[in-house]
């Protein structure tokens, strides 16, 4: 009798490298490949267990002396925007969001390059080429979409890609319990629009419409100013050694509150 078994995923550990968020710290990651017929199922399980996806890799911090990286997810069905978030929604009332298959475009890369050059000149992604970007978008074995955010132009109708300037884009995985924001970027010259906040609010709206509970934001690092924005979206849960627990925002410094 022939019995077929599904191979278990193999996990690997990276060598130590400088932490991009906390000075004087070293980071290590544990990772596995998301390929094959069970890739989407594994992505769900691993994301719910604190992993993040990058291309066909799922990874999680495995640092020897630091536990600062904390997985964060918004409780979408309970979420209500704050006054400042309502102002962000109003400021972007002229924006059309359209969902597409995970396929790159030269227009996307041009905006992505502009974002990196302004926001992440020293980061690990700073030298990404157009081919690197295409791989980031296309190399997925799960249910991945790219959402484009464009300024509405008169005459925009039912065409496949609405007219208007591309302001922002988000690479997003649809999972059994919600949406996971894999990577997002925007025009850094339009600071008054708070496009990063707007994209998160749009993902909460989409998750609510799907009747699903969670929007996964990746890792929050207390002490890293570039991560502070994630705690403004309440209520939310943080993954602790005891599992997912509701986060108390009153424990944060005032600067991170609305």
From Swiss-Prot:
It is found in: Cytoplasm. The gene is bpt. One of its GO terms (biological process) is ubiquitin-dependent protein catabolic process via the N-end rule pathway. This is Aspartate/glutamate leucyltransferase. It is an enzyme of class 2 (transferase). GO terms for molecular function: arginyl-tRNA--protein transferase activity; leucyl-tRNA--protein transferase activity. Keywords: Acyltransferase, Cytoplasm, Transferase. InterPro entries: Acyl_CoA_acyltransferase, Asp_Glu_LeuTrfase, N-end_Aminoacyl_Trfase, N-end_Aminoacyl_Trfase_C, N-end_Aminoacyl_Trfase_N. It comes from Rhizobium johnstonii (strain DSM 114642 / LMG 32736 / 3841) (Rhizobium leguminosarum bv. viciae). Functions in the N-end rule pathway of protein degradation where it conjugates Leu from its aminoacyl-tRNA to the N-termini of proteins containing an N-terminal aspartate or glutamate. GO terms for cellular component: cytoplasm.
């Amino acid at each position: 009798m022939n019995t077929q078994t599904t191979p278990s995923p193999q996990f690997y550990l990276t060598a130590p490298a400088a932490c991009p968020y906390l000075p004087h710290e070293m980071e290590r990651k544990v990772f596995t490949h998301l390929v094959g017929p069970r890739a989407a199922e594994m992505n769900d399980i691993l994301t719910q267990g604190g992993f993040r996806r990058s291309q066909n890799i799922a990874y999680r911090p495995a640092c020897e002396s630091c536990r600062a990286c904390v997985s964060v997810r918004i409780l979408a069905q309970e979420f209500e925007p704050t006054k400042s978030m309502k102002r962000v929604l109003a400021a972007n009332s002229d924006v059309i969001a359209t969902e597409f298959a995970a396929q790159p475009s030269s227009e996307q890369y041009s905006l992505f390059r502009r974002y990196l050059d302004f926001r992440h000149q020293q980061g690990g992604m700073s030298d990404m080429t157009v081919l690197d970007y295409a791989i980031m978008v296309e190399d997925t074995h799960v249910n991945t979409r790219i959402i484009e955010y464009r300024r509405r132009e008169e005459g925009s109708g039912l065409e496949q890609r609405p007219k208007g300037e591309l302001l922002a884009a988000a690479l997003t995985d649809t999972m059994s319990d919600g949406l996971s924001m894999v990577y997002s970027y925007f025009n850094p010259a339009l600071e008054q629009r708070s496009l990063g906040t707007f994209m998160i609010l749009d993902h909460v709206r989409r998750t609510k419409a799907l009747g699903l509970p969670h929007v996964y934001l990746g890792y929050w690092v207390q002490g890293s100013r570039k991560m502070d924005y994630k705690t403004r979206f309440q209520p939310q849960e943080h993954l602790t050694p005891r599992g997912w627990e509701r986060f108390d925002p009153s424990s944060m410094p005032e600067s991170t509150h609305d």
